[in-house]
Amino acid sequence: MFKKRLNKDKINDCYTWEEELPDGSYDMGFHGNLNHMEKGKSGYVTHKQLDKKLEVFKQDLLVELSEKFVTKEEFRAQGKQIKELQIEQKAQGKTLQLILEALQGINKRLDKLESK
């Protein structure tokens, strides 16, 4: 394994040693000229790279609604329109309630006139 690692890192003129210590453990080392060492790709991502990826993802975020793709901004605009429609519907409900009360008042007056 140690020789494989040395070949991978391209170390030339290398001397290795291994010696057993009195406590039963081993001491191992090497000495040589390092011509070229290649750094392997790591699976790690920096915070800056992650932030860039997340920003791109947020900008390209798509939501599928009833077989139509909508961007986040269009989705927010539709949310505002829905809120406005709900407010208008409440106002119409109040107006209808006032009309119903007025008709009930007229109906009571007509009943009084008929009873006389």
Swiss-Prot record:
Gene3D superfamilies: 6.10.250.40. It holds the Pfam family DUF16. Disulfide bonds: none annotated. It comes from the Bacteria. InterPro entries: DUF16. Belongs to the UPF0134 family. This is UPF0134 protein MPN_038. It comes from Mycoplasma pneumoniae (strain ATCC 29342 / M129 / Subtype 1). The lineage of its organism: Bacteria, Bacillati, Mycoplasmatota, Mycoplasmoidales, Mycoplasmoidaceae.
